[in-house]
Amino acid sequence: MLGDGNEGMSTIPGLNQIQFEGFCRFIDQGLTEELSKFPKIEDTDQEIEFQLFMERYQLVEPLRKERDAVYESLTYSSEFYVSAGLIWKTSRDMQEQTILIGNIPLMNSLGTSIVKGIYRIVINQILQSPGIYYRSELDHNEISVYTGTIISDWGGRSELEIDRKARIWARVSRKQKISILVLSSAMGSNLKEILDNVFYPEIFLSFLKDKERKKIGSKENAILEFYQQFACVGGDPVFSESLCKELQTKFFQQRCELGRIGRRNMNRRLNLDIPQNNTFLLPRDILAAADHLIEQKFGMGTLDDMNHLKNKRIRSVADLLQDQLGLALVRLEDEVRETICGPIRHKWRTTPHPQNLVTSTPLTTTYESFFGSHPLSQVLDQTNPLTQIVHGRKWSYLDPGGLTGRTASFRIRDIHPSHYGRICPIDTSEGINVGLIGSLAIHAKIGHWGSLESPFYEISERSTGVQMLYLSPGRDEYYTVAAGNSLALNQDIQEEEVVPARYRQEFLTIAWEQVHFRSILPFQYFSIGASLIPFIEHNDANRALMSSNMQRQAVPLSRPEKCIVGTGLERQVALDSGALAIAEREGKIVSTDTEKILFSGNGDTLSIPLVMYQSSNKNTCMHQKPQVQRGKCIKKGQILADGAATVGGELALGKNVLVAYMPWEGYNSEDAVLISERLVYEDIYTSFHIRKYEIQTAGTERITNEIPHLEAHLLRNLDKNGIVMLGSWVETGAILVGKLTPEVVKESPANRLVYDIVGIQVSTSKDTCLKLPIGGRGRVIDVRWIQKRGDNDNPETIRIYISQKREIKVGDKVAGRHGNKGIISKILPRQDMPYLQDGRPVDMVFNPLGVPSRMNVGQIFECSLGLAGGLLDRHYRIVPFDERYEQEASRKLVFSELYEASKQTTNPWVFEPEYPGKSRIFDGRSGNPFEQPILIGKPYILKLIHQVDDKIHGRSVGNYTHITQQPLRGRAKGGGQRVGEMEVWALEGFGVAHILQEMLTYKSDHIRARQKIPGTTMIGGTIPNPEDAPESFRVLVRELRSLALELNHFLVSEKNFQINRKEA
């Protein structure tokens, strides 16, 4: 895939494969497993029995298409039918019927679900795998304390600990612990069975005293003792069935259910052979765990690494959907039981059918609630195609049953050797969740037991062929695995003596004959985002992390351009993202236009609809452009249309622009960027953004273009229905939808007189029009008037879509692919920009001080190689870690290409041996050359979604908080500028007393002074100085009064300096 020279390399699997496999596993296995748990339901008289037959169920093809579901804000789902039976025991008759129990949201070709018209995706969660784990900690006396933690399938934890006297305790809470003999007896074992099933019975007998022997004399005594400790109940409780039931519900069901994975882990760790279908904790498990704990105490066992991936499990979309189905079936069971056992059954006049007992509400509402509110169900990030595909490969330690950002330790966040080839060590979030949210490696997949697996090539002397195996984290630590960037991986130099390899979480240097497996790709252990960074091996990991995140923030441009220097993954990322239109079979193009492509094949004519100016969840523009011509024959899999941020079927997030690394009058200090006006006038970095504005009408509200008290020019864009016309240009404050809401009118003599004379009831309406908010301007490209089917009382929804064209401007954020980011500080005329020796002015000027301290030298290689590629009209696809072929391979490649470009273009300044990669350039203002040679090149620069149009904000008059009377905070609320301590110090330092007084009084919380300003300003008078305390000070006084503290304050008069007492 990546070139003929990369022999033995594997093609990369579908990047959406994890989501697809999870959903298919839910359909194939999860539905059957949950239906098999549905019990038979009988009425109170045991005359009627209801049951579901798990063998016969079906999912019906959706009634509507994906596009219609998005357009109408509905759920793209399939009806779930199950065969059910209603048995009358007295007559032995059974009515069997296929019933509808609800709708299940389906997964589309992008690996996402459409719920209420919104694309949503379920991310993977990493949890501690159920089983038992042994660890050692030091107590306050610096003595090692050994514990064994049993984790249930639901996340509940119980601990076994051994003290100095080798007594073993089971801790059921933080404060309460009981003897392991009492726990085993409460679970049904007597003393003889306990001693027969342990390896060290003498240790168990050593702490068995008379009092302890009485507690385990019978199962009832053990249960009473256990209940007294577990429930913290005083006195002498009496044994009863209700006590056993409560103990079963609160302890054994929550903390002792191991599940399928937990039973497998428990058998492996404790060397047991308990059947897999026995998923609950048994006395045999407890006793075996105690034996291993004794061995740990005396140094005969090995402790567990809780952060090793073999001790983790992946909770994928299949597990989450199956859990929700189980929850919905429990609710359905309660509903059916209430119907059968309720008083309404005596009123049945005819024989009921199974469908009469079941409604689709429990299943449908459960899934809609899950997709709408569960933390692991997120709105799909559609900023660009890369973002969409990376979002489905995310994993998280957080959310239900997991960790929190404030309590997670550094050890959990850190990189672990078992992450090799499974979890990307680079790509993670920044901030408080660093190390807790990340991306899967490019080849990782989820195994049958919920573990992350990675592929490796097996090296065997018996077979000459290459065999690829997927290894789980527990298996590969028993083998030596050679790294993918090793020199000895090339077949020509396999006689190297030693190679770097990994064995048992250690990185060693061993002989090639001792290697069992080797990696299949050099970037196998990176995520998609990190694999798109060229020369990543020359960058610091922190900057690579930033680049992985910033590539997902790149805005699709109106004229995209594929990168000169890439890694080779750009085509597959674009293909798997769903942004392209692909031919599903061979045929011939009949016609093409902006809306659809018609092509004929096998006697049929197919129509492929194209995406036209569709708004994404991030307000970016999604649009497809045909790439085939009429009459052209196409093959299966050929690209028919490019999407947003794709060119020729490859990912294209930015532009190749001419860049110089030099200081320029201080305008590019501190990561600021200087750009040429060419980028503005030639629409180099112009992007389109589509915003959605909507309004609902219900009841007596009406949409109209006749709005009283509004001037005609404000309604000029409305049609006869009161909705803005397509193609209209609208500015801030423009009316998009005219709407009137009736108000209740108080009865008055004047209104009664009008009614008596004219016979018309006086009514008033309130103006509730939809207006374009601050910052909104553009062209109306779509209007949708939607009403839900089947009910006229449902509120109507009107959506207005406005397209906004944004050129690059001062305040926008740009970034490269190496973590080199900056804000546009100044736009210079092209004649003032520094220019090359051939007269071309540069497009951007970066600060050279941003390279050495941040150690992202990869941008220098990309910059120089891009210059050579631009002159030679070549595109390069560089696989990371190219030094595995030759030392200094990156430097040699760049210099050789620059030398060839210099020869072919007859421009010796392209490659000058004295300072290769640099050139003498000239100041555009004076024409004089700069003193030092300057690095110039053509890197790939992205325009990010952090744009000044979304951030800039101004306020003159707005809302205030009720308590402190200070302006609100934030742009969304129309808030004011915040002035804190440091801002006050800065103003004090410059001695601007009047500005400081305005900030703290008139513009803040001084109510009386604030009210005098408008009138004083209109008549041109002098604004009086405030003479009383501001409102925040009054709040402080009232707070102190609530604590029974009286605070009196005094104001000094400027005229006579006499002290006057003022009450707050």
Swiss-Prot record:
Signal peptide: none annotated. It comes from Jasminum nudiflorum. DNA-dependent RNA polymerase catalyzes the transcription of DNA into RNA using the four ribonucleoside triphosphates as substrates. This is DNA-directed RNA polymerase subunit beta. In plastids the minimal PEP RNA polymerase catalytic core is composed of four subunits: alpha, beta, beta', and beta''. When a (nuclear-encoded) sigma factor is associated with the core the holoenzyme is formed, which can initiate transcription. One of its GO terms (molecular function) is DNA-directed RNA polymerase activity. CDD domains: RNA_pol_B_RPB2. Transmembrane segments: none annotated. Keywords: Chloroplast, DNA-directed RNA polymerase, Nucleotidyltransferase, Plastid, Transcription, Transferase. InterPro entries: DNA-dir_RNA_pol_bsu_ext_1_sf (IPR042107), DNA-dir_RNA_pol_su2 (IPR015712), DNA-dir_RNAP_su2_dom (IPR007120), DNA-dir_RNAP_su2_hyb_sf (IPR037033), RNA_pol_bsu_bac (IPR010243), RNA_pol_bsu_CS (IPR007121), RNA_pol_Rpb2_2 (IPR007642), RNA_pol_Rpb2_2_sf (IPR037034). Its EC number is 2.7.7.6. Belongs to the RNA polymerase beta chain family. Coiled coil: none annotated. One of its GO terms (biological process) is DNA-templated transcription. It is found in: Plastid, Chloroplast. It comes from the Eukaryota.
